[in-house]
Regions:
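Hydrophobic alpha-helical segments with strong N-terminal bias
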Residues: 9-12, 57, 469
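Serine-hydrolase catalytic core recognition
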Residues: 34, 212, 274, 428-538
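Beta-propeller folds
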Residues: 21-416, 438-439, 449
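Bacterial Sec-dependent N-terminal signal peptides
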Residues: 1-27
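Hydrophobic alpha-helix feature that most strongly marks membrane-spanning transmembrane helices
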Residues: 282, 296, 310, 335, ...
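N-terminal hydrophobic or amphipathic segments with adjacent small-residue motifs
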Residues: 12, 17, 228, 235, ...
Length: 538
């Protein structure tokens, strides 16, 4: 037989085998593959517990904790779970199940913070010893550990404690040390330690005048009634005060905020010297916000720094943040131009203050010098931290296609390239900044990449890759996901959509459509991340 004939037979014999393998590889998804908790649930690889110890990256595994040098990616064993548990057992201090919950808040000390069975334990991983132990009362919740001095603020039921000392003794209907105002306006906690831990600000919410609404606890063996205080439309709402507790004297004062008592007190922060408390007060109609400064010792109002109004609404979301290198200047965030941006404020001088109109239709007045640092048709997300050496604020920026991390110089206003410039600027990027601001852990995904984790040098933008996850649906038959925009009724505003077509989609057929819309605030459903933000079961 000729060589050509032999080749033809070999190719023909190989084709059915190849087609058979391909047919076997293409699988159909089931609910078990798509629903969290399913026996075959498909999820992307991840690295849990990544964080910084100063400028050294901590990378835990199930039984070993590694350090990663951010310049080279070199990994070194820091300690093991077995070693930690041996010391804990020797001191009858309990057992740590995994290393993923360990914190490393002290950049200048070889110490870690453990939380085990209602106790906070400071552990020296260099000398393998327990430095201190603090036990909380039973039913402790809303815990707030002060890194500066090791004190812990927490609540038991509706009252506030510091360590084992009760700070408040209020009856049912008055709640202390918990988040207030239904967690709106950036509120997600109820206690605020001063920078050195000498004072503790906290919320006190009187809702005794609010009617109770019955909810059913379905987790009990037999359903139980759980009454919550919830003001129905037009009915009396709760009243909030801000207290300041001094652990050294045991005394508490309250800010003299005056009337009306049903307004919102949001975005609490401290001055670096602990002498002043700053907060943004919002009226009940939510259309007039005022940045106020109070004396932390007397509770007296020291002055108004900024005011903003709008005929529709004003929505403060972020507390002011002082520059680490200048205690007289802070960063303020505002949506006054239609997009959330950063503003640099200076306390060293004052202004007479005049109302000025804003591009977004509102008005503002400044009683201290204020300079806009960022601008454009995009949003500032969270401030991630600072690089004091380069005088930079490092933050997350968000636009219609995704998010990324940037730096802006407070002196010049110059903004950096996106930190992921050397890898991909596409997708959703979430950053965790090192202590000095020199490095950043960048977790991100794109519509076709489930997850990648890099360490980024915030100056050179060079990266060290820690993880590139494989597609968990590789080998499965997948639907087609399309994204785009349609115009709102005004004919101008773009509304982003995500369209998922079935795997056997026939363009010549007419299909029923399930339209899912949740138009709530801060509920972005279409993203530039993995599968454009679609959940597996969508």
């Amino acid at each position: 037989m000729s060589k050509i004939g032999k080749r033809a037979i070999l190719i023909l014999l190989a084709l059915p085998i190849g087609f058979n393998v391909m047919a076997q590889e293409i699988k159909k998804l089931t609910l078990e593959d798509l629903i969290p908790g399913g026996e075959t649930y498909r999820y992307a690889e991840n690295l849990y517990g990544l964080q910084w110890w100063g400028d050294v990256c901590i990378k835990p595994s199930t039984d070993t904790i590694y350090t990663v040098q951010p310049k080279t990616g070199k990994e070194t064993v820091l300690t093991t779970l077995g070693q930690i548990n041996k010391v804990l057992a020797d001191n009858k201090a309990g057992k740590l199940p995994t290393p993923y919950s360990i914190r490393y808040p002290w950049a200048d000390k070889p110490q870690m913070l453990l939380k085990i069975s209602g106790k906070y334990i400071v552990y020296d991983f260099e000398n393998n010893r327990i430095v201190s132990t603090l036990k909380l009362k039973d039913k402790a919740a809303n815990e707030d550990y002060c890194v500066a001095n090791g004190n812990v603020a927490y609540t038991v039921n509706n009252n506030l404690y510091v360590n084992e000392q009760a700070i408040t003794d209020e009856p049912e209907g008055i709640v202390c040390g918990q988040s207030v105002h239904r967690n709106e306006f950036g509120i997600n906690k109820g206690t605020f330690w001063s920078p050195k831990g000498n004072l503790l600000a906290f919320y006190r919410m009187d809702e005794s005048m609010v009617t109770q609404y019955p909810l059913v606890d379905i987790t009990a063996r037999v359903g139980e009634v759980n009454n919550v205080r919830y003001p129905m439309a037009g009915m009396t709402s709760h009243q909030v005060k801000v207290g300041v507790y001094n652990p050294s004297t045991g005394k508490t004062i309250y800010l003299n905020a005056g009337n009306p008592t049903d307004r919102y007190f949001t975005n609490i922060s401290w001055s670096p010297d602990e002498k002043s408390i700053y907060l943004i007060e919002l009226n009940r109609d939510q259309n007039h916000a005022v940045l106020c400064q109070y004396d932390a010792t007397t509770g007296k109002l020291l002055g108004k720094l900024l005011e903003e109004t709008h005929t529709k609404y004003v929505e403060p979301q972020h507390p002011i943040v002082f520059l680490p290198w200048d205690s007289n200047k802070f960063i303020y965030q505002s949506q006054r131009d239609g997009y959330n941006h950063l503003y640099l404020c200076d306390l060293t001088s004052s202004l007479k203050g005049e109302w000025k109109s804003d591009a977004a239709g509102g008005k503002h007045i400044e009683y201290i010098p204020t300079k806009q640092l960022t601008e454009g048709k995009w949003l500032v997300g969270d401030i991630l931290g600072f690089n004091a050496k380069r005088k930079e604020v490092i933050f997350q920026g968000v636009d219609g296609t995704g998010s990324n991390n940037f730096a802006v110089n407070v002196n010049t206003g110059k903004r950096s390239l996106p930190f992921s410039f050397r890898s991909t600027t596409e997708g959703e990027h979430n950053g965790m900044l090192s202590a000095s601001g020199s490095y950043l852990i960048d977790r991100y995904s794109t519509p076709t990449l489930p997850r990648r984790i890099d360490i980024v040098d915030t100056k050179s933008l060079k990266t060290v890759n820690l993880l590139t996850a494989k597609d968990p649906y590789e080998g499965y038959e997948m639907p087609t996901i399309e994204t785009g925009t349609i115009k709102a009724d005004d004919g101008t505003t773009d509304l982003y959509y995500r369209l998922t077509k079935p795997t056997d989609f026939d363009p010549n057929k007419k299909y029923p459509v399930i339209v899912y819309v949740y138009g709530g605030p801060h509920a972005q459903l279409v993203t530039g991340g993995w599968l454009n933000g679609s959940r597996a079961w969508h």
